């Protein structure tokens, strides 16, 4: 009777509930670490001379120094990965609440043409220059995708069809993260030198900087309008990820048609958070959000993006750039310079101002 009574009083926990509890326990420490770094980055802005520096930029720098100085503890890794993926995507979705369809239309056909031309030219140039340098084809394609579209997310998505070694994936991610971080430092310094207005600077950052969070952080360094426009431009670029992966998948199947063993088809991933971003723009268009609530949303979004940048820093191992020699690193650097120069040239040649 006692066993029956105990079974009624303490029914067995549902397996899904147990799994969820274990998952939350695994990611909590790392999420707290990224939140602490984000809080420190926000707090550092109170220091005289620091207010003009984005907390997102400070967060990734703190993360890089911490990871390469003392290392990221193993117990924090699950939460760090969660912040880099889920938290980042949720923050991007929330960014939609700061935008309207009128702003979305501002990119226009010419702006989209600049973004598309930059993407295609950068990918083709990187693949060609990789052959010139003698870099492995798979690693070259990963660096090309990461540089031309959206950094680590594009590399991971592209690898579903490229099927490179884990070391190549790690190298490519480190490459685009490091050179994207350098762009975060240099771009704001060049805005006035290059005589770019808010729209021009936003388009330049959105069309050329690798990671979404990096592009958002840099574009907002040029002001609210530049930040909003840079976000739209960058998300427009991300939408081109699926077509690129489809094209690479078709190319991979052509290469593998004489290999009878193994199915080389792959379903290209859809960056679903882009749909959430667009949905939030629609919400902002048709729902009257109080000004005070919008202020909180802006602050929360910036904090979540800082968490994602902190996680990116905590996964950036500078030694990985040296592990496979200098040629792939040279390829990544050259590709980064190419996309910056090509997109800027198109903006200047077309006289684009939004």
Swiss-Prot record:
Gene Ontology CC, one term: plasma membrane
UniProt superkingdom: Bacteria
Membrane-traversing stretches: 21-43, 58-80, 87-109, 113-135, 142-164, 169-191, 235-254, 269-288, 295-314, 329-351
Compartment annotation: Cell membrane
PANTHER family: INNER MEMBRANE PROTEIN YEIH-RELATED, UPF0324 INNER MEMBRANE PROTEIN YEIH
Broad class of the protein's primary localization: membrane
InterPro entries: UPF0324_pro
Family, similarity comment: Belongs to the UPF0324 family.
Membrane-related topology note: Multi-pass membrane protein
Keyword vocabulary terms for this entry: Cell membrane, Membrane, Transmembrane, Transmembrane helix
UniProt-recorded name of the protein: UPF0324 membrane protein RPA1770
